[in-house]
Amino acid sequence: MASGWFYLSCMVLGSLGSMCILFTAYWMQYWRGGFAWDGTVLMFNWHPVLMVAGMVVLYGAASLVYRLPSSWVGPRLPWKVLHAALHLLAFTCTVVGLIAVFRFHNHSRIAHLYSLHSWLGITTVVLFACQWFLGFAVFLLPWASQWLRSLLKPLHVFFGACILSLSITSVISGINEKLFFVLKNATKPYSSLPGEAVFANSTGLLVVAFGLLVLYVLLASSWKRPDPGALTDRQPLLHDRE
């Protein structure tokens, strides 16, 4: 029964994640003029789409790989590769999203990294990069000792949840900041809740719902991967023969 609830949660997460990306893309296409790669505001429009796709949806999916019951038995190698690959894909989307916003700022002569949103965002990306490279070095390569892996595993899990929480916070602050900027001198101000504001606010709520459900699945003790024992724990990926 627990497995059934888990897969139901996965279906809900898949739907919510897809809606987060599609809603963000529709907002940029319908209200903000679409997409381009020319340094203009149309290039900026890639930024929210790629950050939601990478730092929230793909990151959340990667975090849940070891919650799949099918990953609890048999060789661990495919699941480790999938976990790392999804995180790498998320990081790639994030880097392209950052390139889009920095090039737009350069083209429009806008200062970089001055808002709280940008500080939160860049902090999250730096933590994500450190988390990925540390995980690769410690849990993938064979040099690390069992003691070091045992020490860092809880920190790896903790910072994974922290990074997802920071990603959600960054997205919400970014949506709010964007609406304040674009509706500041509009015919209908933000305070009058025009259609764009309602849609973007709803997109933000979808992101929050997705993130909270991911965190719930991660924290649910009945859905955690069973401890395979000390012997398996000290085997690095490159020596996995299960």
From Swiss-Prot:
GO process annotations (BP): intracellular iron ion homeostasis
Outcome of substituting residue 190 to A? No effect on transmembrane ascorbate ferrireductase activity
| Name of the top EC class for this enzyme | translocase
> Which Gene Ontology terms of cellular component type are present?
late endosome membrane; lysosomal membrane; lysosome; nucleolus
The cofactor note reads:
Binds 2 heme b groups non-covalently.
Q: Where in the cell is it found?
A: Late endosome membrane; Lysosome membrane
Q: Which residues are listed for heme b 2 binding in this entry?
A: 67, 83, 156, 224
In this UniProt entry, which residues form the Cytoplasmic topological domain(s)?
A: 1-4, 62-81, 141-154, 224-242
Enumerate the transmembrane spans. 5-25, 41-61, 82-102, 120-140, 155-175, 203-223
What does this protein do, in the record's words? Answer: Transmembrane reductase that uses ascorbate as an electron donor in the cytoplasm and transfers electrons across membranes to reduce iron cations Fe(3+) into Fe(2+) in the lumen of the late endosome and lysosome. Reduced iron can then be extruded from the late endosome and lysosome to the cytoplasm by divalent metal-specific transporters. It is therefore most probably involved in endosomal and lysosomal cellular iron homeostasis.
Q: What is this protein called?
A: Lysosomal membrane ascorbate-dependent ferrireductase CYB561A3
Species of the source: Mus musculus
Q: Which gene encodes it?
A: Cyb561a3
